[in-house]
């Protein structure tokens, strides 16, 4: 019997290892094929956060991890109801505004449009509404947007993207609220909602390498002796900037196609000086909101209380007028 349990445990461990390896291979393959072999438009890929931070996209400090790759800060907005009833579908609208005329560099260095992506962190128990609970009107508003849970056990954390920014500056999430009557882990009260939205490509890959959508800096102090343009076997163009220090060998900084060089041969530079402009026009923003899971019975009692107060006020007014009439009659008598 013990051997059977041991075998089952080993089988589960083996499956977990295989799954992890497959995810890693898929991630690495996608990275190289999408950005090198098949350059795409400037995109925002929220699933990088899934692969790099599988537990949660929010750090203990409150920062959403997308900011680790998208270094520029931009505005993100969210609209959620102030309160919702249990087991109801409502809209959470994430707005990712940017200048639609803006273009940035793609992986091949060409100017392309921006894509957008978003992560919506709902309270425990909240999740994307199943299709049979979404009204036809809401389906039209959502369009072809595909919603993906951050992980199998976190249906309340949802990611979307990449989507074409020209069409999706507003992303509508159809959210189903939980019902405390059927789930004892859920309680009525006020909850926090965390939202992150990014437009365009990041400046740093999850591996720590810079993308070509970033500023490149001098790695040594000295004089630029040569700037050469080179193309590798895969057709990727890059610039080689030779820096001659006062002593020692020449230092060669590689700049990919995309950012524009702002230095020239014969120019003196210091370590950290910018060799290129900043081509990035996108960025990431996050915002928090609050939502109340309202008890319908409390709402009914509140309505009854307000009605009672209003009735009492009406009765007082009528009584006051009655007293005034009696007083007037006594004075006339």
Swiss-Prot record:
GO CC terms of this entry: plasma membrane-derived thylakoid membrane
Protein residues bound to heme: 45, 66, 69-70
Protein topology in the membrane: Multi-pass membrane protein
Disulfides per UniProt: none
Cofactor requirement: heme
Keyword terms of this UniProt record: Electron transport, Heme, Iron, Membrane, Metal-binding, Photosynthesis, Signal, Thylakoid, Transmembrane, Transmembrane helix, Transport
Biological process annotations from GO: photosynthesis
UniProt GO molecular function: electron transfer activity; heme binding; iron ion binding
UniProt keyword Iron-sulfur present: no
Cofactor binding summary note: Binds 1 heme group covalently.
Subcellular location: Cellular thylakoid membrane
Signal sequence interval, chain numbering: 1-16
PROSITE patterns: CYTF
Primary location recorded for the protein, binned into one broad class: membrane
Regions that span the bilayer: 17-36, 299-319
Top-rank taxon: Bacteria
Family that this chain belongs to: Belongs to the cytochrome f family.
Function: Component of the cytochrome b6-f complex, which mediates electron transfer between photosystem II (PSII) and photosystem I (PSI), cyclic electron flow around PSI, and state transitions.
Subunit record text: The 4 large subunits of the cytochrome b6-f complex are cytochrome b6, subunit IV (17 kDa polypeptide, PetD), cytochrome f and the Rieske protein, while the 4 small subunits are PetG, PetL, PetM and PetN. The complex functions as a dimer.
Name by which UniProt lists this protein: Cytochrome f
Annotated source species: Nostoc punctiforme (strain ATCC 29133 / PCC 73102)
């Amino acid at each position: 019997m013990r051997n059977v349990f041991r075998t089952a445990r080993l089988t589960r461990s083996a499956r977990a290892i295989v799954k992890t390896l497959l995810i890693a291979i898929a991630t690495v393959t996608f990275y190289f094929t999408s950005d090198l072999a098949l350059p795409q438009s400037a995109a925002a890929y929220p699933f990088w956060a899934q692969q790099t931070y599988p537990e949660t996209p929010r750090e203990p400090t409150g920062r959403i991890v997308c900011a680790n790759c998208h270094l520029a800060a931009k505005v993100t907005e969210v609209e959620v109801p102030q309160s919702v009833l249990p087991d109801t579908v409502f809209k959470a609208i994430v707005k990712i505004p940017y200048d639609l005329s803006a273009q940035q560099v793609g992986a091949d260095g060409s100017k392309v449009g921006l894509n957008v992506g978003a992560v919506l962190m709902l309270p425990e128990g909240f999740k994307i509404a199943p299709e049979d609970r979404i009204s036809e009107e809401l389906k039209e508003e959502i369009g072809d947007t595909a919603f993906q849970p951050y992980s199998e056990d976190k249906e309340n954390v949802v990611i979307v993207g990449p989507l074409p920014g020209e069409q999706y500056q507003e992303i509508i999430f159809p959210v189903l609220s939980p019902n405390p009557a059927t789930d004892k882990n859920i309680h009525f009260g006020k909850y926090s909602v965390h939202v992150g939205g990014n437009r365009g490509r990041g400046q740093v890959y999850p591996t720590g390498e810079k993308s070509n959508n970033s500023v490149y800096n001098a790695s040594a102090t000295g004089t630029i002796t040569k700037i050469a343009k080179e193309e590798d076997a895969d057709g990727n163009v890059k610039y080689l900037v030779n820096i001659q220090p006062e002593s020692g060998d020449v230092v060669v900084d590689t700049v990919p196609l995309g950012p524009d060089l702002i230095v020239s041969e014969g120019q003196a530079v210091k370590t950290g000086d910018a060799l290129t402009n900043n081509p990035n026009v996108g960025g990431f923003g996050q915002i928090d909101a609050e939502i109340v899971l309202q008890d319908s019975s409390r709402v009914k009692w509140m309505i009854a209380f307000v009605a009672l107060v209003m009735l009492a006020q009406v009765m007082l007014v009528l009584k006051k007028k009655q007293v005034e009439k009696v007083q007037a009659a006594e004075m006339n008598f």
